[in-house]
């Protein structure tokens, strides 16, 4: 036994994980090295603690106190209603446009998820979502960034977080499409970390083969550590980037680098700004932003009883109205502060079915939804909210900005998202004076127009032809 092994063996014994070495003697040297490397990177004690905590039912008193203390979020910029509101939004837009012109904005797309609900066999960004063409999610975002760059004569770096599950294919896809003409040197792919799944009953780390732990991406909260370890926080600082526009891979109608959102964020010197939309019903399965003891936090829909979800404040408005669209703007220095102590973002436990190799070396694929065999661990980026000293919430226009692709069918599916893209296109065309029947699909590339005003102007000048849409 070499000294590395004896050290590893001690740690494994102490944390009841010796089964990881069960097949060590049967492995090739490189497999042995790889297994020891995976074990070396794993915080065995922390995993043990988390598993132990997961076997208690948590602290229902703390959870109940959190919900009782929750108030409607305080600092919210609402959608404009009055002329004064419109003036405020106009001013914020001008401030945001200036930040863009000055080159202070970068986009971060988190694209490391496994997209299991959609059931698409490739990274979700490669999903064809165009109502008339096979335009993918990646292409829509790339074209939005290119169009913003052209409009403001500026550089907007694009940072894409991938994972073991999505990296190689994403890289090949972007190469094959020549980075959609953004220039390879301004698109940064970086990989998030991964964490092993644990057997829910025993806390033992699951293995996917004789030499591999059953790993999965460490959640969108893995962004903070991943940015830092890829050296990107330094790079952003060198490029004088101040604002990181964060969004998820699944919403093709997000307004990337939305000048109004950027403007409010910059005006208020917010460290973390979040776009929210009004929930359609209290029962809607959406996390909501609230104020808890003076801090902004997210309450997950699963934390609320139906009665709590429908609770109203003194103005008769739902307390839990402000649905999280996962569109955020981070102040770069705030991200640096988070990265300096990454343990500030807690690990969350989710019970899921995870395939694994049993003690005889055979693969088992549990599939009982009522009794998941494993716990998976993830960090959530929105846990940064209560850490921030200065947060801001801006209400977005739901039908325009939030039409995600989550499920294979039904709500939040390719059908609803494609229909939204067509509807938005029809609205822009109507504003330009062209009526299109409701059942006719419309697809407007961000390179043709980023909004209704631009489309009107370009149709008038002939730069865009009706026949092309
Ligand atoms: P979701 O919570 O929708 O998860 O991710 P998912 O993995 O994409 O899909 P399901 O739940 O398996 O169906 C929201 C966003 O966070 C990213 C996803 O790529 C998506 O943009 N994400 C999620 C990561 O980048 N890494 C992760 O580890 C998890």
Report the location of each language-model feature.
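N-terminal glycine-rich phosphate-binding loop and ensuing alpha1 helix
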Residues: 3-188, 196, 207-225, 229-233, ...
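Generic detection of intrinsically disordered/low-complexity segments and helix-coil linkers/edges
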Residues: 17-18, 250, 396
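Short, flexible, glycine/charge-rich loop motifs used to bind or transfer phosphoryl groups or to couple energy/partner
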Residues: 96-98, 234-235, 263, 318
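Hydrophobic/aromatic beta-strand patches that form the interior of the parallel beta-sheet core
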Residues: 108, 127, 159, 188-190, ...
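Residues immediately flanking
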Residues: 111-112, 249, 332
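Conserved beta-loop-beta/alpha segment of the NTase-like Rossmann-fold superfamily
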Residues: 184-284
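Catalytic core of tubulin tyrosine ligase-like
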Residues: 240-245, 253-257, 262-439
